């Protein structure tokens, strides 16, 4: 069975992963069929590049992504796009839906950032108040 999974590269304490299509019996960093993307978890925010056409090809031929790779693919919107294609939607519908999805993701990121900012400010205010007393 073919799996789409992470292959670790990089150096000690600074991981860099290649997203590869590989036989499930092959070792993690061993033989693979094709490199379909890269993932750099140490970058802020995490850097993910995926060859969408190759990932969709491998998934249509039966390759199963691992849990981590599935979440990375989901974060790029490719799973949503593949689902729409499997439902037989037209290209115009898919494009419109993906734009809507992208806008929704941007709004969610902004909300999360606003919550983090409020929490930081509240923590600083509490520390300043504690320092006065």
Curated annotation (Swiss-Prot):
A GO CC term assigned to this protein in UniProt: small ribosomal subunit
Keyword field: Ribonucleoprotein, Ribosomal protein
A Pfam family recorded for this sequence: Ribosomal_S16
Cystine crosslinks: none
UniProt-annotated stretches for the region Disordered: 99-133
Family: Belongs to the bacterial ribosomal protein bS16 family.
HAMAP family: Ribosomal_bS16
UniProt name for this protein: Small ribosomal subunit protein bS16
Source species taxonomy: Bacteria, Pseudomonadati, Chlorobiota, Chlorobiia, Chlorobiales
């Amino acid at each position: 069975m073919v799996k789409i999974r992470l292959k670790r590269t990089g150096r000690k304490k600074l991981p860099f992963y290649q997203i590869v299509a590989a036989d499930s019996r092959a070792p993690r960093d061993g033989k693979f069929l094709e490199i379909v993307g890269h993932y750099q978890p140490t970058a802020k925010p995490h850097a993910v590049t995926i060859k969408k056409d190759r990932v969709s090809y491998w998934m249509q031929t039966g390759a199963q992504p691992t849990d981590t790779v599935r979440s990375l693919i989901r974060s790029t919107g490719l799973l949503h796009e593949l689902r729409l294609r499997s439902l037989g939607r037209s290209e115009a519908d898919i494009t419109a839906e993906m734009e809507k999805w992208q806008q929704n993701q941007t709004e969610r990121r902004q909300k999360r950032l606003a919550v983090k900012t409020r929490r930081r400010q509240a923590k600083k205010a509490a520390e300043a108040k504690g320092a006065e007393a």
